Design a protein with these regions (language model features):
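A short glycine-rich, Lys/Arg-flanked "PGG" loop and its adjoining helix->strand segment in the class I
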Residues: 127-139
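C-terminal lobe and adjacent flexible extensions of AdoMet/dcAdoMet transferase-like proteins
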Residues: 209-247
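Conserved class I S-adenosyl-L-methionine
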Residues: 1-49
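Class I SAM-dependent methyltransferase SAM/SAH-binding core
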Residues: 57-102
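Glycine-rich SAM-binding Motif I of class I
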Residues: 51-55
């Protein structure tokens, strides 16, 4: 039986990720200038997990109001801890527990981050998402979207070591594998192993089956009358709010 993915990631994820590797972690290469978020308006971090992207957003825009949206309670607890212990962002960062479809948001926001989230939204949910964002973004404000769509591998991705880190006497290892799961989904299995002095003392295994989406499908769903689409680089697209046409 698989363990809860969010609970396991809350325990192991940042231990394996921190400190940030500037050469490999996407946080170090967010294309802020080309995205051109509007920093004198509220900025949204959608599905921000434990808050590493929220900290990056707040650091890039040191005067902006930040809205951090994270429905999962375990990940949100890590997010809130990160915000709470930093007085320079605590007063201007609001942590919101609902999904992006249901959450309160202020009018006239200046942009949003959407990293590694879109493939967890079904087709009708994506339609509602774009409609919601059209209501809250000002003209010119972008949704900076990572080009990660949960693609189904053509063949089995064999289990392999995807990361390791140490803390005290423990070494933490993450093993990754994936395969097509049918009905447009991919099965992703992560196995976490804890070693003490070389001896295995704990394991956890998670299985998720996100939608596998082609970029062409995602982009075709974006309402062109409301947004323009800008290819920034191989990792990011800016979906930018356009002025409503007046008749």
């Amino acid at each position: 039986m698989a363990d809860d993915d969010n609970a396991v990631w809350a325990e192991y994820g940042d231990t394996l990720r921190l400190p940030i590797d500037a050469d490999s972690d996407y946080i170090s290469a967010i294309p802020w200038e080309r995205a051109a978020l509007i920093g004198d308006r509220p900025l949204i971090d959608i599905g921000c997990g434990s808050g590493l992207t929220t900290l990056a957003l707040a650091a890039r825009f040191p005067l902006a109001e930040i809205l951090a949206v994270e429905p999962d309670p375990l990940m949100r607890s890590l997010l809130m801890l990160r915000v709470a212990e930093r007085p320079e962002i605590r007063s201007r960062t609001t942590v919101l527990p609902e999904s992006i479809l249901d959450v309160w948001l202020p009018d006239e926001c200046g942009g949003a981050l959407l990293f590694n989230v879109i493939y967890f939204l079904g087709g009708r949910t994506r339609d509602r998402f774009w409609t919601r964002m059209a209501h809250v973004l000002v003209p010119g404000a972008p949704i900076l979207m990572s080009r990660s769509y949960g693609g189904v591998p053509d063949t089995l991705v064999e289990r392999h070591l995807a990361g390791s880190a140490t803390m005290g006497r423990h070494e933490y290892q993450r093993f990754f594998e994936a395969k097509p799961a049918g009905e447009g989904r991919v099965e992703i299995v992560n196995t976490y192993v804890v070693l003490r002095d070389g001896e295995q003392v704990r394991t956890a295994r998670t299985v998720v089956t996100p939608l596998s989406l082609d970029e062409e499908v995602i982009l075709s769903e974006i309402p062109i009358g409301k947004f323009s689409i800008e290819e920034i680089d191989e990792n990011y697209i800016a979906v930018r709010r356009q002025p409503d046409l007046r008749r």
